[in-house]
Structure formats: structure tokens, C-alpha cells
Amino acid sequence: MATDRRVELSSVRNARSLGGLHAASGRTAHGVFCRSDVPLSLTEEDICVLRSYGITHVLDLRSEAEVQAHPSAAKACFEYLNVPLQGGDKIPQTREEVPASYLNMTMGTTQMARAMRFLADAPDGVLIHCTAGKDRTGVVCAILLMLAGVTDDAICEDYAQTEIYMEPVLVQLCAQNSALNFDALVARKENMQAFLDAFREKWGGAEEYLRYLGLHPGQVNRWKAKMTKQG
């Protein structure tokens, strides 16, 4: 069950492991990647929990302005890199705009290449986060899961977990700001599926995309093997 992958942290709502998902050669491995919303604070217990999941590195996908306004507490505890994704800080106004906004992030190939090399070169586990852990994090994690041979249904199901964990926060945000469209903010499975379809039409697939970014085939294959386990 996807809910069994949740990582319990005191100040983070939307943290979960990318391990345990059905993949082409078995299941995705734990201790490789976790995803979350921004950890604004981390207790000693939280740090121990993340380390128990193998986390030694953190990739922050937010804009420089977001990082300056709300620094990630993970920076002081782990090997940290901030890579703002193209258009990632722009909020879609309607649900129909969501898949196109996700595809636009993949067009920022300089930023995406830097992020993917960081993930590929990390010797241990990496926590990937943005602000809510939905859009930018969702795009990067979808590419990783495609590479591992995870089915579209499982990728969309993982993405939709954010709706469960973050809905109270989104309801509050929309109540405070009438310009926000709740329907465009929630993590709908159909939005992720539309992105996956558009991504393949544009790039061919995850391996083709990573090679376009400059990762060589041997590096991609080792990365794929690291992400999956037999059985």
C-alpha cells in the first residue's frame, strides 16, 4: 500500500519513501529516494528518522526567493543542493494548465541536468523537496519512477498521496487567498497521467530524457539498478 511508505516527521506533512512500488524487475528500493514538502524545522528525532531511511543528501527544487524567505532546515544537517526548476514557482490557475506546467519544467534542461546529476552521483539516499512536495517534486519523482519501470498507475497513485496529506493546508491557503483555485492545487491522478503522456510524446521516455541531459548509458543503467530490487 502506498500509505505504508509515509515517513513520519514532526514538522513535515507530505514525506514518503519512493521504495516499495511495483517496478519492472521487482520493487523500487527503500533507502534511495524520499520526497516531501519543505522541512522548515527538523528535530533530532526527525534527523534520525531520515537517516534511518538512508538519507544523506537533500535536493531543494524551490526558487532562490522561496529559499531565502523560508530556508530548508535540512541544509544544516545533510549534503544540500538548491536547483530551481524552470517555471516551478508559477502556480497554475486552472486544473487544465497543470500538465503543461509540468512539461515546461522539463524544458529547463540546464537546471534539470544539474538536479539529475546530483541524484545520480549521491552515494546514499536523497530527500527531494520543493514547497508542498507536489509539483516540482512530483515531476522529478515521476521521471525517477519511470526510469525504474514503475507503472503509470503506481506513479499517479504516489502523486495523489499528496492530496491526502496536504489537503487541510490547501483548504486553508485558498480560504486566505481568493485568487487561488483549489482544483488547480490538489494532486489529481489524471493531471499526472496527462503529464506522463505529454512527457513521452516530447522526450520519448525517462532514459531518452536523461541521456539528452548528458547522463551516459552506463550511468543511467547503474542508477536504474540502484533504484530497484529483485522480487
Where are the model-predicted features located?
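Cys-dependent protein tyrosine phosphatase-like superfamily
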Residues: 1-127, 140-231
